[in-house]
Regions:
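Elongated scaffold/linker segments in the mid-to-C-terminal portions of large proteins
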Residues: 42, 48, 57-59, 81-104, ...
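Acidic, glycine-rich segments characteristic of secretory precursors and extracytoplasmic regions
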Residues: 4, 8, 20-69, 115, ...
Length: 509
């Protein structure tokens, strides 16, 4: 306050000397403008930080509505009380508000990344500072374009930061070109970022390489995907599989399996339900309360489907127990199961006997450490890229390159961690059988992570999966309503209305 008063006083004195002879051009010292910003390394780091908004924001990738949108279309969950029933039931249209917000959040981050990339080129900063700023900006832009391509298909590719309305009209690029832009950005990020980012919440070289390999998988460029991902299994990288439970709670975040996480904490303001960029926003996530039983402070928006449980329980481990990944992801009525610090049986006998036979999501929940999700705040990071994903993507690459032994080798690393028998002990050495185990292992490993529907689409299995679950009350309408146009979301109406060169993608015209 004292400093502000001094500035105002100095301005007043200056004005008294100048009088009316000259116009006085005063800038508000408390307002950030292009003229006062973009000066220091700190300014650029703040600008990059603003680009992460789409990943944490309520409407963004790992936010409340973004996560529910990504998981609601697969066969692995039953959307009991969906946040957006039209998306879950395949009746959404181009004016759907949830998809519009999700789409816009990516372009908001892209605009911020573009600003950083465009403006830093002529700055006289150290190479170290420039590299990490450019690396993060390219990573963020690549992340956005990868997800826009896999969720909306053909979209505009914007690479220039501009406030000029004349620059806004832009035609869509084909999905392959959008993926190519993601490849370009992740490749650039891998060249700029350090092997280990000093800030664990930020991407590293390995993060960029892992996503680059994943884009190649989506492009079905198996050779390049293998060549990209394989180095992550060797020195100088030190990734490895850890106890699966370490990937589901707050206690072991940033462990050796983690390649990229979206961070949450109890820091920040008090506003949990932040629909805009609010200085009072909490840095926590509201996801944990979405799936818990109401008696544990939850909303019971979704539960584990019986189709998914059949996959979880298809194999016993070497000790005759259910798969540890099932037990760490789901609570159900089995001996020793705990649910919000009570035995599962005790909790439901006391609170809701009728729902005792259901399967309850506990992955990324506070069930082990809290009695309730009542305040709706959680600090559990979302694990966006794990080493397990790299191994299973490599298994898929090897299989598509006709190297069955290589695929089985990667599968066995996943199976060993789960204490399952080696693949060859239980299954046939055929392309079909190996692929089926890849499908099953991905469903189990990445349950609740929002991978399932995209996996089913790229394998051409959406209709088959929906047909298998059509007798489930929560999936009957999905089966009835689904047509191929629902493989991707339509370009939102607002983009079509405001971008004169943007045309709706063919299935939605």
């Amino acid at each position: 306050m004292k400093k502000i008063f001094s500035i105002i006083l100095a301005a007043s004195v200056s004005f008294s000397f100048i009088g009316c002879e000259n116009e006085l051009n005063l800038q508000n010292p408390n307002k950030v403008t292009d003229g006062t910003f973009w000066k220091t390394v700190g300014d650029f780091k703040q600008a990059v930080n603003a680009g992460y908004v789409n990943q944490k924001f309520m409407l963004g990738y790992s936010g409340y509505t973004g996560t529910l949108m990504r998981i609601s279309r697969g066969d692995d969950v039953d959307m009991v009380a969906p946040n957006d029933g039209s998306i879950a039931g395949f009746t959404n249209t181009f004016d759907n508000g949830t998809a519009q917000a999700y789409f816009s959040m990516f372009y908001k981050s892209i605009a911020r990344a573009n600003d950083v990339i465009n403006r830093i080129q002529d700055k006289d900063f150290s190479k170290e500072d420039k590299d990490i700023i450019l690396g993060e900006a390219h990573f963020l832009r690549g992340f956005c374009y990868f997800n826009l391509a896999r969720h909306f298909q053909n979209v505009p590719v914007r690479l220039i930061a501009s406030q000029d309305p004349a620059d806004y009209p832009l035609a869509t690029s084909e999905q392959s070109k959008v993926y190519e832009q993601a490849v370009s950005d992740f490749s650039a990020a891998a060249g700029y970022l350090p092997l280990q980012n000093p800030n664990k919440a930020k991407p590293s070289k390995g993060s960029a390489v892992a996503f680059l390999g994943k884009v190649y998988v989506y492009m079905e460029n198996w050779k390049l995907a293998k060549e990209t991902l394989e180095p992550l299994t060797k020195s100088p990288y030190t990734y490895k599989l850890v106890d699966f439970s370490w990937n589901t709670t707050a206690e072991h975040e940033y462990n050796e399996e983690s390649i990229y996480e979206v961070p949450f904490s109890m820091a920040g303001g008090s506003d949990i339900w932040t629909w805009g960029e609010d200085p009072n926003a909490s840095q926590s996530t509201a996801m944990a309360c979405q799936f818990a039983h109401p008696a544990a402070g939850g909303w019971r928006q979704a539960r584990v489907s019986r189709t998914m449980m059949a996959t979880f329980l298809a194999e016993k481990d070497k000790d005759g127990k259910d798969d540890i990944r099932a037990r760490e992801s789901v609570a159900w009525d089995y001996p020793g199961c705990m649910y919000y610090k009570q035995s599962f049986q005790e909790f439901f006998d006391k609170n809701d006997p009728a729902l005792k036979s259901e399967y309850w999501i506990i992955k990324y929940q506070n069930s082990k450490t809290q009695e309730s999700e009542g305040d709706a705040k959680s600090a559990i990071n979302e694990r966006i890229m794990r080493y397990a994903n790299v191994l299973l993507l490599l298994a898929e690459c090897e299989l598509n390159l006709q190297n069955q032994d290589g695929a089985i080798g990667y599968l066995n690393q996943i199976r060993d961690r789960a204490n399952l028998n080696k693949y060859e002990v239980s299954y046939a050495k055929t392309q079909e059988a190996i692929m089926q185990d890849i499908i099953n292992q991905r469903a189990i490993e990445f349950f609740r992570d929002g991978e399932r529907f995209d996996d089913l689409r790229r394998w051409g299995l959406i209709k088959k999966a929906l047909e298998a679950g059509k007798d489930n009350e929560y999936h009957t309408q999905q089966y009835i309503n689904y047509t191929d146009k629902y493989q991707y979301f339509p370009i939102p109406a607002k983009e079509i209305q405001t971008n004169s060169l943007c045309e709706q993608n063919a299935p939605w015209k």
